Amino acid sequence: MENLEADAFIDPFPHLIIKNFYNDDELELIWEELKFYTKPGKLLTAKDFGGVVKKTNSHALLLDAIYTIHTGKNPVNYRKVSNILTVNRKAFDKSILEALSSLHECCVHAKDANHDVTKVRYYHNGEYYKPHRDTLQQFLAFSYFYKEPKKFEGGELYFPIYDYEVPCDNNSIIFLPGWVEHGVREVKIKDSDYYDGYGRYCISSFFGQIE
């Protein structure tokens, strides 16, 4: 893996931010799949993708539900068919997980992560995610994408308890513990059809260690 520079923070909670995370070839593969999903009837509402209905009006897909078939004793794994589920293995590189583990004792098990699930989420005009905690998940990784020139405002990742905010810079990724309360500020965009893809994309990975 190419050299990446990470910004590590302990306050107001442990988190790791890496800018320009994916290279050009990886971005091409990611955008190929994002464009495929940004069509009528493909992105689902919260009640259908496992989101918190009272907290968000954004649309998403749980990719693992599409590319893994749980029938019988042995699940059939088609994750390699997905560009995103293939390329985002980069987020679980040993060096990155060790860096996250070293931030604070509450993150020490990140280096032992052996399980993850991934959602693709799209925010267009008027869409948001109210503050919540992913308490069933040990760790989170959010990577952001949008077409340039950028047409929307808002979409920042914010943490009301800490009066803290992180911008959704294009091709950046943030790692943090699942217990941290977080939300997404409302996206505002003018002169843009929902399906032209000029909103805010987030690839959300939920990961940790299971037996």
Give the location of each predicted region.
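A short glycine-rich, His/Asp/Glu-containing loop-to-beta-strand
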Residues: 109-122
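Non-heme Fe(II)/2-oxoglutarate
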Residues: 2-104
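Catalytic core of Fe(II)/2-oxoglutarate
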Residues: 137, 147-211
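Conserved short histidine dyad/triad with adjacent acidic residue
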Residues: 119-135
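Eukaryotic charged/polar low-complexity linker/IDR segments
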Residues: 140-142
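Short catalytic/ligand-binding loop motif for oxyanion handling, primarily in non-cytosolic enzymes
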Residues: 25-27, 114, 127-130, 183-185, ...
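Short beta-strand segments enriched in hydrophobic/aromatic residues
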Residues: 22, 34, 145-146, 207-209
